[in-house]
Structure formats: structure tokens, C-alpha cells
Amino acid sequence: MKRIAVLTSGGDAPGMNAAIRAVVRKAISEGMEVFGIYDGYAGMVAGSIQPLTAASVGDIISRGGTFLHSARYPEFAQKEGQLKGIEQLKKHGIEGVVVIGGDGSYHGAMRLTEHGFPAVGVPGTIDNDIVGTDFTIGFDTAVTTAMDAIDKIRDTSSSHRRTFVVEVMGRNAGDIALWAGIATGADEIIVPEEGFKFEEIVASIKHGYEEGKKHNIIVLAEGVMSADEFGEKLKAAGDTSDLRVTELGHIQRGGSPTARDRVLASRMGAHAVELLKKGIGGVAVGIRNEKMVENPILGTAEEGALFSLAEDGKIIVNNPHKADLALSSLNRSISI
């Protein structure tokens, strides 16, 4: 394989630029030509494809977002959109594609592979909801951003003896809430993967105040409900504390990536090129026990929440390895 392309798709994540940089520089070192596809699959269909050099990706490793830009393009789910994109790839002599993004992006990569264009997925999403990898690019930065914000909220919460509900991102996965909640010593961590009762939370808040506690921090994953709705239901369940709600929002998707995300993105980008060089497509790279791995895209493009609830109320473990990591971390924090 002599000519490949790289694109970013879906929601942006800190570290995407580091991954692009690794793809470009690794490919050049292997004697390949590299093209950047701007604006994701929409740009592929529109022919927004330009050659990239080592200079093109200079000084981007520390930048958040993606310099290739990103866009959601549901039309690529249709065969007509796929064929238009493939026509553009052929026009530029491209033989393989690295797709950086989340589960929706992976579905597009799978379609490309089915049409004879090897595509390798690189997990770029702050949600950490991709099966087959312990961590996704951007997750560590998002957790760090949430942690910093919650630390600041704790200062004002304690000053005014208030209860704060802090809503963090993560879509249908509670990973950001779990890790940020542990890191900030939150009083309650509410995630989609685990049930809860408002009455029990209210009782816990009341007991805390009776024991001399000055304030409370509740970290809420957006996949459960909005912070406003949660606050209203908490009040309806009998909470009488001075309650405030905060939605951290898109600040979690921005900012300079952490060292961990930069290194992770660099390793994943380079590994994706190694796979394409061997003619391997239809797979997504990941990290397991600090080692690079690859898994069939078909299995990794499903929802990657750690747990889900069955109709009988039992917890189903969707990703045992990630669940073990999270639960062991939670258990350690409780025992400290």
C-alpha cells in the first residue's frame, strides 16, 4: 500500500490532532503518501482531500480539536453516499483510510472495507464508550477538565454550604462521571449503568448535615437525565438543602490534550498505519493492559457502556475488562 488517507468524524476529542500527526509521520517513514480528508465523510464525498506532509502536522500535537475538522454525515450510511465517497478515493489513488472517531465513524469505516477499501478505526471520543479498548483518545483530558471544574465548584459549594449537582458528558456511558467523581471525592456518582433512588440520596444528604457536613457534590452523567431535571426530582423527594446545578458541557471536549492522551493517540495512529501497510482493514485499534491491540470493527462499533440493566433489574457487564478497571478504581477510592 503506497497511498493512504486520514479523516476525523463525529464529535471532536482532545488528542485527535496527535493521532493525525502520528498517522502522517509514520506513513511517510514507511514510504507512503498521505492525504487528509477534511470535514469527515462529508468531505470525502465532496472531494475535500489534500496531500499532507510532515510540515503539515508540525506543532499540532498540543492542540485540541482536529485541524482536519469534523462533521456528522448520516448520508454516508446509505449506499449512494458510500459510492460517491469511494469514487473520490479512487480519483486520488487512495488505497486505505484511517478513520478517527467514535462508533458512528466506525460504521462508515466498515462500509469502506466492505467496498474494497481497507479502513482502520482509531477510537477518538471523550465518552470512552468503544468496546475493545480500555481507553479512547480524549477521555483522559475530558476527565481532567471535569475534575478541575468540580474542584473549583467544591470551593464555592463549601463556602455557601450548598449541594451542587454537576452534569458531565459521556452520552450513554458513565465513564467520565465515574472517574471524575472518584478523583474529586464526590458524595454521589450517578451513572446510567447503575440504578439509584432519590429518596436514598436525600436521606444521605440529610444524614451528612446532621453529622456536621457542610456541603455536597453530586456528579451526574448526562445519560441519566439533565442536571435541572435531577435537581427538581431531588427536591420533590424531600431535599431541603440549598441546591444548585451546573452543566459542564462542551468545555470537556476542548483544550490541550493531557500527556496520556497525546501518547495514546500517537501509539494508536502509528499502529493503524502498520495495519494498513499489511493490507489489513475492517479493524479498530485499541489499548489493553498498555499494549496495542486490534479488534473487528463490527464488534467495537456497538454501544460501549460498562454496564446495562436487564428487564429483571440485573446488571449486565458489557465490557468485562473495562468494568474491572473501573470497579477496582472505585473500590480503592472507597477504602482510602
Swiss-Prot record:
<feature type="binding site" description="in other chain">
    <location>
        <begin position="125"/>
        <end position="127"/>
    </location>
    <ligand>
        <name>substrate</name>
    </ligand>
</feature>
<dbReference type="GO" id="GO:0030388">
    <property type="term" value="P:fructose 1,6-bisphosphate metabolic process"/>
</dbReference>
<keyword id="KW-0418">Kinase</keyword>
<feature type="binding site" description="in other chain">
    <location>
        <begin position="250"/>
        <end position="253"/>
    </location>
    <ligand>
        <name>substrate</name>
    </ligand>
</feature>
<feature type="binding site" description="in other chain">
    <location>
        <position position="222"/>
    </location>
    <ligand>
        <name>substrate</name>
    </ligand>
</feature>
<keyword id="KW-0547">Nucleotide-binding</keyword>
<dbReference type="InterPro" id="IPR012003">
    <property type="entry name" value="ATP_PFK_prok-type"/>
</dbReference>
<dbReference type="GO" id="GO:0048029">
    <property type="term" value="F:monosaccharide binding"/>
</dbReference>
<feature type="binding site" description="in other chain">
    <location>
        <begin position="169"/>
        <end position="171"/>
    </location>
    <ligand>
        <name>substrate</name>
    </ligand>
</feature>
<dbReference type="GO" id="GO:0003872">
    <property type="term" value="F:6-phosphofructokinase activity"/>
</dbReference>
<keyword id="KW-0479">Metal-binding</keyword>
<comment type="subunit">
    <text>Homotetramer.</text>
</comment>
<comment type="similarity">
    <text>Belongs to the phosphofructokinase type A (PFKA) family. ATP-dependent PFK group I subfamily. Prokaryotic clade 'B1' sub-subfamily.</text>
</comment>
<keyword id="KW-0021">Allosteric enzyme</keyword>
<comment type="pathway">
    <text>Carbohydrate degradation; glycolysis; D-glyceraldehyde 3-phosphate and glycerone phosphate from D-glucose: step 3/4.</text>
</comment>
<dbReference type="GO" id="GO:0006002">
    <property type="term" value="P:fructose 6-phosphate metabolic process"/>
</dbReference>
<dbReference type="GO" id="GO:0046872">
    <property type="term" value="F:metal ion binding"/>
</dbReference>
<feature type="binding site">
    <location>
        <position position="11"/>
    </location>
    <ligand>
        <name>ATP</name>
    </ligand>
</feature>
<keyword id="KW-0067">ATP-binding</keyword>
<dbReference type="GO" id="GO:0070095">
    <property type="term" value="F:fructose-6-phosphate binding"/>
</dbReference>
<feature type="binding site">
    <location>
        <begin position="102"/>
        <end position="105"/>
    </location>
    <ligand>
        <name>ATP</name>
    </ligand>
</feature>
<protein>
    <recommendedName>
        <fullName>ATP-dependent 6-phosphofructokinase</fullName>
        <ecNumber>2.7.1.11</ecNumber>
    </recommendedName>
</protein>
<dbReference type="InterPro" id="IPR015912">
    <property type="entry name" value="Phosphofructokinase_CS"/>
</dbReference>
<dbReference type="GO" id="GO:0005524">
    <property type="term" value="F:ATP binding"/>
</dbReference>
<dbReference type="GO" id="GO:0061621">
    <property type="term" value="P:canonical glycolysis"/>
</dbReference>
<keyword id="KW-0963">Cytoplasm</keyword>
<keyword id="KW-0324">Glycolysis</keyword>
<dbReference type="GO" id="GO:0042802">
    <property type="term" value="F:identical protein binding"/>
</dbReference>
<feature type="binding site">
    <location>
        <position position="162"/>
    </location>
    <ligand>
        <name>substrate</name>
    </ligand>
</feature>
<dbReference type="InterPro" id="IPR012828">
    <property type="entry name" value="PFKA_ATP_prok"/>
</dbReference>
<dbReference type="GO" id="GO:0016208">
    <property type="term" value="F:AMP binding"/>
</dbReference>
<dbReference type="GO" id="GO:0005945">
    <property type="term" value="C:6-phosphofructokinase complex"/>
</dbReference>
<feature type="active site" description="Proton acceptor">
    <location>
        <position position="127"/>
    </location>
</feature>
<comment type="function">
    <text>Catalyzes the phosphorylation of D-fructose 6-phosphate to fructose 1,6-bisphosphate by ATP, the first committing step of glycolysis.</text>
</comment>
<dbReference type="InterPro" id="IPR000023">
    <property type="entry name" value="Phosphofructokinase_dom"/>
</dbReference>
<feature type="binding site">
    <location>
        <position position="103"/>
    </location>
    <ligand>
        <name>Mg(2+)</name>
    </ligand>
</feature>
<keyword id="KW-0808">Transferase</keyword>
<feature type="binding site">
    <location>
        <begin position="72"/>
        <end position="73"/>
    </location>
    <ligand>
        <name>ATP</name>
    </ligand>
</feature>
<feature type="binding site">
    <location>
        <begin position="21"/>
        <end position="25"/>
    </location>
    <ligand>
        <name>ADP</name>
    </ligand>
</feature>
<feature type="binding site" description="in other chain">
    <location>
        <position position="154"/>
    </location>
    <ligand>
        <name>ADP</name>
    </ligand>
</feature>
<feature type="binding site" description="in other chain">
    <location>
        <begin position="213"/>
        <end position="215"/>
    </location>
    <ligand>
        <name>ADP</name>
    </ligand>
</feature>
<keyword id="KW-0460">Magnesium</keyword>
